[in-house]
């Protein structure tokens, strides 16, 4: 674990100081009369999915335990609404001793606009995903391809840290490289398991385009749009169009 992430690990209830946001950007409370309905859908949806998918999750857990050492569930500190840190859950898809410095450098270069330097001009390289990543286990590749690795985040939804639909929750070190306009995606609404950018292009979307789609969702969000995104997510997952 890097030193830069340690403060967030020690106290996951303390938000980022307001003066940490540059150029006067400040969190704004989420507004809208649909918030209560959205929360109800989150609780009912996440709870129902956990029950329905419990056998699949058990199979995934057994496969992880049988093929590699380490915890079954990967825990990582992410930033939620208003920059508040929380513990984010996924099924572990990497070797337990995997070094995160590779991903850190990739993400920092991506956000800083140095994509060509690391992708050799391939603008369609999967966002946040390193192609043929040697850190990923054989079982992990299947979990990622089918998006099964994301299922533990349903617990985050029940806990109120995430929503079924919303922007992707960033890692703390990513935000250090955000431009001011990028920050809105983590300030105003809860992060989600799926969102507009995931169903629009999944992992093939560029970073700036991802942020634009997140902001578009924030402007236009309503229950009908959430339901549409959820239905499209089912279609995308059934196509196994997840990360490689």
Regions found by a protein language model. Give the residues of each.
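Short, glycine-rich, amphipathic interfacial segments at transmembrane boundaries or analogous
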Residues: 14-19, 73-134, 194-212
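Hydrophobic structural segments characteristic of membrane proteins
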Residues: 1-23, 127-130, 134, 140-244
């Amino acid at each position: 674990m890097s030193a830069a992430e340690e403060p967030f690990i020690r106290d996951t209830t303390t938000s980022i100081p307001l003066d940490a946001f540059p150029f006067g950007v400040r969190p704004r409370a989420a507004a809208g009369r649909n918030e209560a309905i959205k929360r109800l859908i989150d609780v009912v949806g996440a709870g129902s999915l956990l029950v329905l998918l419990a056998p699949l999750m058990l199979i995934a857990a057994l496969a992880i335990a049988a093929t590699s050492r380490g915890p079954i569930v990967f825990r990582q500190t992410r930033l939620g609404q208003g920059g508040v840190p929380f513990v984010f859950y996924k099924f572990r898809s990497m070797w337990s001793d995997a070094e995160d410095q590779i991903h850190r450098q990739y993400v920092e270069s991506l956000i800083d606009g140095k994509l060509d330097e690391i992708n050799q001009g391939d603008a369609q390289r999967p966002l946040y995903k390193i192609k043929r990543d040697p850190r990923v286990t054989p079982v992990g590749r299947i979990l990622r391809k089918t998006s099964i690795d994301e299922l533990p985040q349903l617990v985050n939804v029940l806990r109120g840290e995430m929503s079924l639909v919303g922007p992707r929750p960033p890692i703390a070190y990513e935000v250090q490289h955000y431009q001011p306009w990028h920050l809105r995606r983590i300030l105003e609404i809860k992060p989600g398991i799926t969102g507009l950018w995931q169903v629009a292009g999944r992992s093939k979307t560029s970073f700036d385009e991802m942020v634009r789609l997140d902001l578009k969702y924030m402007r236009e969000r309503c229950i009908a749009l959430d339901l549409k995104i959820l239905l499209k997510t089912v279609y995308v997952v059934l196509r196994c169009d997840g990360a490689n």
